[in-house]
Amino acid sequence: MNFGYFDDEKREYVITRPDTPAPWANYLGSPEYGALISNNAGGYSFARSGANGRILRYIFNQFDQPGRYIYLRDNESKDYWSASWQPVGKDLESYKSECHHGTAYTKMLADYSGIHSEVCYYVPLNQTYEVWHLKVTNASACERNLTITGYAEFTNNNNYEQDQVNLQYSQFITSTVFETNRIRHIIHGNLDWVKEGEEVDNKLAISRFFALTGAPVDSYCGDKESFLGRYHGYHNPVGEENGKLSGEMCYNENGCGALAAQMLSLIHISEPTRLALI
């Protein structure tokens, strides 16, 4: 069974079937800001240390989730899919995709329902943030009213073990706020005696953010449970089913960054939208 090939000229490994027997991953970034991304956009990011500088959550020994997810929704038909095959997982008879793992970048191409999308994930040189750059082309015979939603799931603690095991404490110290075009995730911000950037009793108040550029934010959500919904998952979040995000923020729960933008896609016109994460 053939899942891909090496492109020697472009120095890429091209995955032509997304249903690989295991996650096939690539490394992005530098020792200052690193990221791991699979062919279905699963993976995590970290600052300096994968153990003690974790930013995006990733659960090992599960199903390559969560990840750097971009959802596309047709507001007329209410159908939605993802720029990578997972997490929505559309039937591969109608959903076509490729993943290009290159040196310090990963590109994902997808075609579904007359819409072509290209997303490139990379860490800019000498920077401590990552960029998800999305380009959408309408290849159908009519105008399309689309909503694009980016989703990132933050860790509640820099230490990955504390984040996934010591939930009573790690949820207590986390919160999110919405600011213009970004969701800011704050750790230890509810402790009055801890100032941002200053360490007190091994506690450090820090912020991360998930921001949208290239289009105004139409709706947003900073709480994981509110975005996904009870008894739902990454493949069918209620935020996508409803067509508009709840606007709910996180306080002492599990934080996330979910930002949605509406776009009217003209026939055979590409409209780039960029999602940036730090």
Give the residues covered by each predicted segment.
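Anionic coordination/interaction segments
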Residues: 1-266, 270, 274
